């Protein structure tokens, strides 16, 4: 018993000693592990518990729900600020004051012009009625003008030709078109002038209120105010009301290359439209001549300008062009290009009416144009502007309140200074012993890889969704409801980014602390934006300033909140300070993103049948999400979980996807307040094909139907069953441009079209085309001289045969320009009256062929008057649903072989 008792005591003593030794050993092992971990990466241990466990400290983890809600509310608040700035069209009202622009008077001009109706070049409405109205108003303005000024008026009717690298390239010829030119100058005259340009013509079947009658109305009112002003002018102001811009910039070419006043012009302001109302955006300046941007910055009362828009437009991804190109390329004159960009859904449609343009839109445009023209008319720089032709400008407005502008070379210096700051910031981290020894570089590089993987996989995901939706025939479901695109593609992108980073956090960085990872991924985002800054600056893009903004403010924010972040961890105070520091880049980012979608979304409804709009929009939206989420990635590593957020995003995306697939969202709208019509072009055409002997080998007639978006006629067929795939048009392989009367060379954009059989059309003014002469030239080429007569708009097509080349012609600069696909396209128009169009082409024949050397065709387009209509065309138009806009006219097509 005693032995047993003694043994028990010994055992208790030994057990206690063993426990103490075990605890000491465990403590020693823990310290060793901690030391080893420190050697591996002290930074990775931020926020660890005192016992060295691997779990994250609760106090450093942000609440998932609260963080997600805070970020969502933050972005919504910024979006609300952007919307507020866009709705505030004028900063101060001056309408009605003596010597100020009066929008009510300008609206009166606008309503009178649009009341005339569609104004196509060559029509009575354009060449007589509109011109008469303009001359009447100019005469009244002249009667009220101040004796300090002199007003001269000239009606120009130029004839000319040029080639243009637009829509794949083609040549333009015009005859007897109309320009109304007004010169306002000091009584003693002036040796230099500033040009203000608008166009009063419109596309067929549209009143053209925004494009471009409102600009002409603004110019009339500016002319009235300036001519009545008691303030002396140093230079002249030439107001050009051109009557053939919609004919691919013909009237501006006629003015700048032929008018005697053109030699006075030192700079210009071009007023255009790609939408209806809203703010007019400065989207092109120069080339070079930074003094022009400075003039706008100094004078404009309601600025709205962006060098980003300029570089996007000049990249060619927007299928449009303006008179700016003509003055720049053919006149070698610098200028400013402005355009209304809001509500492009009704641009070039019957809905482009005067009542849709707000009075404040007219007021702000008038205030700006008047102020800038006054500034330039008294500028010492204008007369010797060539001396100031150096470099380009970085310019951007801040919510329409002011414009910041500086030379691009200064911008490059600033950008590289910002890059150096980032290099110092990251270099300092790498030089810290704890980071050098902790494989910070490895974690950083892995973080970059994870970020790029998340972006790539998210882009692939939304593209798969977009392609699937396109294949099942549900494209453009977001066209009438843009939030559908956000709920479908935006949520998918965000969910995939969060998912990839959550996997990295759980399986790769499982032993790293939240705070360490939060800082690490801030650094990776900073580095990515810095890399973009370097690339854009090196390539000479002025829009690199945006990347600089997305580097400077986040870096300053990080430096300001770093101590608080280290001391207190990721808490509400940190989130508030962090979001406050990101205010400027995110606000301006959303501001630009709005502009991008305001321009591109309507364009995708008229971009042709070959470009899947969902793929384009999904890509743009995914890139925007990547940019906006870049500095929010850090929160993925600071929250306690992301499960609910991912599930919510997936749920929203899945529900939207199912609704889209079921056809719940119809793309188009006939809502009178905000119509978003489907564009369809109808041409009742009679075609005649001749062989080499001149005999007719084929003759047919029908209504040629082109849908200008990716959905084709799928939504129209239920309303008009006869328009179905059984009448799909077939390409005539041996004929230029597939044997159809293309108004412009957009055949590569619209390959899906329909040909509904219909009776032959017989216009009262039929087109005539004949070979005048065929001559063999001394240099072994064949010169073919042709003569054509017909309506105000015609198209001429040429295709050379094997062994033949088109060496020269009497059009443009004499050098034939091929269109996309290898054929030659000539756009012809004339004013109210014109003589026969005579021209020649010269064909070099290296090898004679039995089928001849060249095939030519001519199409006549009847865009105005009674000739534009046919009973079959009218009957078909009536069948189209009210959510569509069918633009219709009559055409003839004749093909010949020589």
From Swiss-Prot:
For this protein, what does the record note about how its cofactor is bound? Binds 2 Zn(2+) ions per subunit.
In-chain residues carrying the UniProt-annotated modification N-acetylmethionine = 1
Location of the active site: 245 (proton acceptor)
Q: Where is this region: Disordered?
A: 1-55
Report which superkingdom the organism of origin falls in: Eukaryota
- Quote the record's binding site residues for Zn(2+) 2: 211, 246, 348
Query: Which cysteine residues pair off into disulfide bonds?
Result: 198-216
Q: Name one GO molecular function term.
A: metal ion binding
- The record places the following residue ranges in the Cytoplasmic compartment, namely 1-66, 415-451, 502-515, 563-573, 637-645
Where in the cell? Answer: Endoplasmic reticulum membrane
Query: Lumenal topology: which positions?
Result: 88-393, 473-480, 539-542, 595-615, 667-898
Q: What class of enzyme is it?
A: hydrolase
Q: Which residues cross the membrane?
A: 67-87, 394-414, 452-472, 481-501, 516-538, 543-562, 574-594, 616-636, 646-666
Cofactors required: Zn(2+)
| One GO biological process term | proteolysis
Membrane topology type: Multi-pass membrane protein
Name by which UniProt lists this protein:
Endoplasmic reticulum metallopeptidase 1
Primary gene name: Ermp1
